Amino acid sequence: MIELVIVSRLLEYPDAALWQHQQETFEAIAASKNLPKEDAHALGIFLRDLTAMDPLDAQAQYSELFDRGRATSLLLFEHVHGESRDRGQAMVDLLAQYEQHGLQLNSRELPDHLPLYLEYLAQLPQSEAVEGLKDIAPILALLSARLQQRESRYAVLFDLLLKLANTAIDSDKVAEKIADEARDDTPQALDAVWEEEQVKFFADKGCGDSAITAHQRRFAGAVAPQYLNITTGGQH
């Protein structure tokens, strides 16, 4: 499915290649057989607006959106397992699937990075690719809702993936669920995460319980990321 390749590329960090090959990308969108005209048009507008930006501005916007906090992380298992040990095994299992289909990762790539997962699905027969999208549909809906809440143009890419998945997920209900969710990309929230890492460090070094308790009281209101149970239709 060429559509998955296109979206994968658009969800990657916007490097110089995006501008160099924008015409080819426009042509690939126009040639798509799985996108209705209105969706192809929306995708074309996204690409037009993105490539109209100064590359440095586009890169800064991308980093602010996807690299700060966990709520809009493009690492799929971040929204399922968090930092639990289950995440490591899930990574191993996914990596094995990639290798079975001849997809080799470099040392800096994580298997659950969404653009990489889409690249993998694009190599599969269409029916299998659609099933692969359905597997992550609750995560896609969650990310779409959070991006819409932040008025980000990137939300259109997740809406498109949900349409390709032909999923029955109610996006309005997902939006309602996260309506009062605290932002985790504010300076205060990011500082709280940093402080939490310090607590873990001090605990490992034998710091007294009183210091840890005092810290926990101070940051009791820090933002905690929501995790999904994708085996039950994306319910928390």
Annotate each PLM feature.
Residues 1-112, 118-236:
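Charged, alpha-helix-forming regions
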